[in-house]
Structures are given as structure tokens and as C-alpha cells.
């Protein structure tokens, strides 16, 4: 029974990692660059939700929808104003820019008096609720994370499988030049990809905040989400979720069964093992370029 409790806890944490990793993969597939600002976008989403609930007095569900919409718009504007002008530059330059964006977002949050430097509780309706089922003590906050992740994955599957927008995004991710000559608005799709990644990061922040707290440093969890994207296969959306679940589960089990300190390094040990066994990740494809 203890093992099952640990697995549920690990799956819930892994869902958070997986959602942030989805943002990594969405942006990578759209622009072939890596955004290390995903953790800070998650943190910003949590603060937006907190502001909507406590300052604006919005009800919970309206706060969630408003936060997701606001972060999606922020992601689109970020791509248009900051990222798009330097596309075509060396990938290292874009990566460093995203790291800088993360620092700027965190710095701006900490500058807000009585908010940015404090730890806050997100007032959700299911805070601290417990379900007792078949001898298991289930944390409702964790179950909401798992359920919401499952629903979001289903919605993303429908988007990319059946909608014209999703199919166009897949085509652009395979070959942007060919997609451009076929009349697909590649630049617009890049902006949508950034907006979608920011919205998913906001959802992750709103799901994580009730389990932990809302604070300026919660964005550092993105450092655990990056290994999830690597394990799943950088470029695979299902792989991001599976990688997150693996990282979360290993982290939960190692934190209980292994000595102190192993929990924080478990994610990177898994990455090292994966790079040795399967360098392209579980769902990654081996790409060959003819010269």
C-alpha cells in the first residue's frame, strides 16, 4: 500500500514535469530552439491566478480561464516581439535569450512589494481535501493534477489529430520551408506554438500551486522538466508526458527508499542512463541529413 501511495504521488509530480516538458517540445518542434523560460512562465501563470482570485475577486474557474488566456496572449506577444526578430541566429543565442527572459520575469515578480518576495497559498476549492479509498489516502490536489493532465492530453491529441490548425502545425514542424511554399503561415504558427506552450505552463502552475505554494522561485522546477523532455524524446509530445511520469515516479521512489540527497539527483541519473541506452529518447526519431 505504501508503494501505491508513492506511485500516485510520483505520477502527480510527473504530470507537472510532463506539462512543462510539453512546452519545451512544442517550441522545439515549431522553431527548432529550446526555451528555458518555461519554468518562469509556469511561475508567472501561478501568480496571475493568485492575482485574479485574491485581488480581482474572480471565482476559481473564471480565474483559471482568464489566467490561461492571458498567458497564451503573453506567449504570442513574447514570440512576436522578442523571439521572432532573432530567428535565424545561432541556436545558442536564442537559448541564452530565453534564459534571460526567465531571469527578467523572476526579477519583475520579486520587485512587486509584499507579493514577489512572499510565499502565497492559492485559494482553490479543493485545498487540503483527502479521499479515503480502499485503504489509500488520496490527496485531492494530486488527483486533480492527474485528471487535468489526462484531459489536457486528450484535448491536445484532438487538436493535432483532427483540426486544421494542428495538422498545419505538424506540417510546419516537419519542414518549415515546404510548409511555407504550400501557403501555410509558418510565422503565425510559431506564435501560436509559443502561446500554447505558455498556456500549458500556466496550467502546470495552477495545478502545482495548491500542492506547494506560489513563490518567485517555483520556476526552478523547469530544470526537472527538461530531463523529462530528454527522456521522452525531444520532439515527441507523448514522450514529454511519459518522460515526466518516469522522472516523477523515480524521484518519489528514490526519495523514500534511498538515502537523503538521491531524490534531487534522480532525474539527472535517469537522463544519463537514457543517453547511454537510447540517446534519442523513448519516442525520439533518429534524424539523418544528407550532405
Which residues does each predicted region cover?
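Short, non-helical or kinked segments that cap or interrupt transmembrane helices
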Residues: 15, 26-46, 60, 88-93, ...
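Transmembrane helix-bundle core of multi-pass membrane transporters
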Residues: 85-162, 189, 253, 258-260, ...
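Alpha-helical transmembrane segments within multi-pass membrane transporters and channels
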Residues: 58-101, 108, 242-247, 278-279
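Hydrophobic alpha-helical transmembrane segments of polytopic membrane proteins
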Residues: 19, 24, 71-73, 224-247, ...
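Membrane-interfacial amphipathic/re-entrant helices at transmembrane-helix boundaries
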Residues: 1-20, 48, 58-63, 89-93, ...
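Membrane-embedded helix boundary and interhelical linker motif in transport proteins
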Residues: 8, 30-77, 81
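Inter-helical junctions in multi-pass inner-membrane proteins, predominant
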Residues: 1-16, 159-160, 164, 190-229, ...
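Helix-loop-helix "hairpin" substructures at the membrane interface of multi-pass membrane proteins
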Residues: 13, 137-214, 237-243
Amino acid at each position: 500500500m505504501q508503494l501505491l501511495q508513492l506511485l500516485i504521488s510520483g505520477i502527480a509530480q510527473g504530470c507537472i514535469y510532463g506539462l512543462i516538458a510539453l512546452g519545451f517540445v512544442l517550441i522545439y518542434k515549431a522553431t527548432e530552439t529550446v526555451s528555458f523560460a518555461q519554468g518562469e512562465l509556469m511561475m508567472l501563470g501561478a501568480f496571475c491566478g493568485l492575482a485574479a482570485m485574491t485581488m480581482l475577486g474572480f471565482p476559481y474557474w473564471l480565474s483559471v480561464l482568464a489566467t490561461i488566456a492571458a498567458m497564451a496572449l503573453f506567449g504570442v506577444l513574447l514570440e512576436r516581439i522578442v523571439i521572432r526578430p532573432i530567428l535565424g541566429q545561432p541556436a545558442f543565442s536564442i537559448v541564452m535569450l530565453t534564459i534571460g527572459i526567465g531571469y527578467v520575469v523572476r526579477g519583475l515578480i520579486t520587485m512587486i512589494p509584499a507579493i514577489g518576495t512572499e510565499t502565497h497559498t492559492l485559494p482553490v476549492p479543493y485545498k487540503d481535501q483527502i479521499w479515503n479509498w480502499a485503504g489509500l489516502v488520496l490527496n485531492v490536489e494530486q488527483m486533480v493534477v492527474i485528471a487535468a493532465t489526462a484531459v489536457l492530453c486528450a484535448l491536445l491529441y484532438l487538436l493535432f489529430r483532427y483540426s486544421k490548425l494542428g495538422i498545419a502545425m505538424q506540417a510546419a514542424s516537419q519542414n518549415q520551408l515546404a510548409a511555407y511554399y504550400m501557403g501555410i503561415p509558418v510565422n503565425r504558427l510559431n506564435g501560436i506554438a509559443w502561446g500554447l506552450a505558455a498556456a500549458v505552463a500556466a496550467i502546470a502552475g495552477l495545478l502545482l500551486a495548491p500542492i506547494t505554494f506560489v513563490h518567485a522561485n517555483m520556476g526552478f522546477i523547469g530544470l526537472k522538466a527538461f530531463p523529462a523532455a530528454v527522456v521522452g524524446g525531444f520532439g515527441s509530445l507523448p514522450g514529454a508526458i511519459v518522460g515526466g511520469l518516469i522522472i516523477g515516479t523515480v524521484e518519489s521512489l528514490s526519495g523514500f527508499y534511498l538515502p537523503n540527497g538521491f531524490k534531487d539527483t534522480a532525474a539527472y541519473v535517469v537522463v544519463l542512463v537514457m543517453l547511454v541506452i537510447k540517446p534519442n529518447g523513448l519516442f525520439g526519431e533518429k534524424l539523418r541529413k544528407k550532405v
